[in-house]
Amino acid sequence: MNFELISEYQPTGDQPEAIAQLTEGVLEGVPAQTLLGVTGSGKTFTIANVIKNINKPTLILSHNKTLAAQLYGEFKSFFPNNAVEYYVSYYDYYQPEAYLPSSDTYIEKDLAINEEIDKLRLAATSALLSGRKDVVVVSSVSCIYGMGNPSDFYNNVIEIKKGKLLDRNVFLRRLVDSLYVRNDIELNRGNFRVKGDTVDIYLAYSDNLLRVMFWDDEIDAIDEIDPVSGIRLATFDEYKIYPANLFMTTKESQLRAIHQIEDDLTKEVAKFEEEGKMYEAKRLYERVTYDMEMIRELGHCSGIENYSRYFDGRNAGTRPYCLLDFFPDDFLIVIDESHVSVPQIRAMYGGDRARKTNLVEYGFRMESAFDNRPLKFEEFKELAKQVIYVSATPADYELVESEGIIVEQVIRPTGLLDPVIEVRPSLNQIDDLMEEIQQRIEKEERVLVTTLTKRMAEELTEYLLRNDIRCNYIHSDVDTLERVKIMDELRQGVYDVLVGVNLLREGLDLPEVSLVAILDADKEGFLRSHRSLTQTAGRAARNINGKVIMYADRMTDSMKKTIDETNRRREKQLAYNEEHGITPKQIQRARNAALLGNNSNEAAGTTQGSKAYIEPSSNTMAADPIVQYMTKPQMEKTIERTRKLMQEAAKKLEFIEAAQYRDELLKLEDMMKERWG
């Protein structure tokens, strides 16, 4: 099936040329291209058109789980008839295993898995292995982390066909081999039940049941059933049932792995003893021996991922399988906000290695733990045959990799221009800022102020409040949901000024903001680099009166570069508007959607743009960005699941945990009422 792009808008401004250039580059096999698109120019809409033109499976890689959810919503609206999938970390909470030698502290792994995201991850891998070409997977950096062998996953796919001879008990054994669990009492995701000649399977990657009816040893009917109402939704002549887990293995592989682990354990224990590390040798022997007993008896153990090399049949030092292995050879990778995403991909391996070094050196884990890891950057590059880097401020790496193939997109469909930038002395900067704020308040516009430190942000906020200016601050110490609430209240007019540090850069979409003030703009460093200044200035680009004031006592190279580039873009935008008779239009957006979703309109760059994305720190389902894209039945199931968890916690007398689930339940019910009444 081919990609079918659904949108009431047509490419305008720089978009047609950008689409043509990028499409031509991909079809000609160009390994790397860069889309340099300013804020609000409709970069997502451009990429959607490129995907439609090339008709290849595509991975959209984002550096942030919340932005990934936003992009997922956008591409879902562009391609409603194609497979648009979502693949991010499925942990609501994750505390990795670690050892701190300085204090002799061992920290056990602790986690909570989000069932809804686990389902979406399985749906993504199932779509990729189905053989269809029209697949878009929106992913965070989780796509470079180790997972099961795609061959093992595919070998456990169960193909059934109406009229085919198949012994029912053989079918049930195959379901168990695919890690489905029989439960005739309560059917949950990943379970199946048997009633006579009818087998109901709650698919691990779907919201619906698959009902397989037998007549003797022949498959009589294959139906998709609504799990709540029992209504038949669809009938199939043939169907592929994908496994219930991404990590597949066989009994033979398991026994072989245990034998190899025990052989290597003997060698590693002997090595510790030779070095005189008797305590470490004893610890390693006891821990691994216990793990092997658990695997023999139960089929799993805590930390089994540290033995993944043995189960996969990989040699020491070889890279793990990851999501990229599930794609065909000719797929495309689009790296969004590449100036942030690429360094993140590069850093993942080093951080993982540093943590595990202590675990291995002190006998908590075998050396095989090193092979349960994210990809090294060089390994990622080998798998990424064709890449489009997308950023308003691409880094030197992307520019070098693209070898000069830079596709520029600076014209906004709204006709809005890049903001005017002024440089003012830092002497009396707060008094000057106060005057500017008062002017914006009179016009009912908003102001963003960026400082260098959290303390400066808090102190400036206190000063402004003492002077009767309604303001608040956001930085990394402010809770995720509270940050979202504060920024939405800024749009609603509860505050006139928002003060922040580094959260006012990529992706913050506040059309009411007409002034961005950058304090200490001449303090060269990460927060005042050319790219940071350009991204920060871009927050004023969605208002027709957009203006940026840099307070500084000298002109740094970063400031000069930012100002020169902004002026160049303004001239090009002005010339285009004059040539085509375009009058800039102020963006109007529904305030309650400021930070909670997206649609094709804004992606096309017509009236809106990308939204704030802030990594969720709460471990509640209500805080997860994917909730906003749930259908009504999905939301009902999530509410019911949360209610069960609350009741189970109460039965165990875990009242604090029960209260947390109760609060989450109330939030989900409120969201349900807001959306569907």
Language-model segments: residues:
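Conserved strand-helix element at the start of the C-terminal RecA-like helicase core
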Residues: 57-69, 86, 277-280, 440-462
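Short amphipathic alpha-helical segment within the helicase RecA-like ATPase core
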Residues: 69-77, 97-99, 459-463
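N-terminal cationic and glycine-rich segments that engage phosphates or anionic surfaces
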Residues: 87-432, 436-442, 461, 495, ...
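Conserved helicase ATPase core of P-loop NTP-dependent helicases/translocases
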Residues: 478-500
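Conserved RecA-like helicase motor-core motifs
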Residues: 80-89, 303, 446-448, 460-482
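Pre-Walker A (Motif I) flank of P-loop NTPase domains
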Residues: 27-34, 56-57, 133-135, 445-446
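Walker A/P-loop
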Residues: 28-50
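Conserved pre-motif I regulatory segment
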Residues: 1-36
